[in-house]
Amino acid sequence: ADKAASGVLTKLPQKQIQEMKEAFSMLDVDRDGFVNKDDLKAISEQLGRTPDDKELTAMLKEAPGPLNFTMFLSIFSDKLSGTDSEETIRNAFAMFDELETKKLNIEYIKDLLENMGDNFTKDEMRMTFKEAPVTGGKFDYVKFTAMIKGSGEDDA
């Protein structure tokens, strides 16, 4: 597990490791150093994902024993690194940005997410846009993409 952890530590940005450590610590209510299925569901939602029960059970099965921080980091880094690249996500938003302002009407985005593709629920929508950069009804997809991918590049 130590070998796996060192690999994880080199491929994740330090900021993301720190965020995951803080999240893990918040979940480990009894401070025993381990997380269970309910804890995993809560942390997934904090990270912007809504896994189903089957996925959570599968994640716990990936750990050879009780889920401590090292195993947690290893498992979640695989899940997080399995997402699209920052550029891919930004380009997907850009397809709807006809004026090339790097901003989209937030109501338009919400309508797309509710009625097309994954059909987001109201709760999923709330979780997704809870900390999204929205000013004057305009959603800044460049900042949002940097935020969800952990690059922290706000000046793009």
Swiss-Prot record:
Keyword line: Calcium, Metal-binding, Motor protein, Muscle protein, Myosin, Repeat
Cellular component per GO, a single term: myosin complex
Protein name, UniProt field: Myosin regulatory light chain, striated adductor muscle
A GO term for molecular function: calcium ion binding
Note: This chain binds calcium.
Binding-site residues for Ca(2+), renumbered to this chain: D28, D30, D32, D39
Function: In molluscan muscle, calcium regulation is associated with myosin rather than with actin. Muscle myosin contains two types of light chains: the catalytic light chain, essential for ATPase activity, and the regulatory light chain, a calcium-binding protein responsible for Ca(2+) dependent binding and Ca(2+) dependent Mg-ATPase activity.
InterPro entries in the cross-refs: EF-hand-dom_pair, EF_Hand_1_Ca_BS, EF_hand_dom, Myosin_RLC
Organism: Chlamys nipponensis akazara
Keyword Transport assigned: no
Location of the EF-hand domain: 15-50, 84-119
Domain of life: Eukaryota
Gene3D superfamilies linked: EF-hand
Positions where Blocked amino end (Ala) occurs in the chain: A1
Classification via SMART domains: EFh
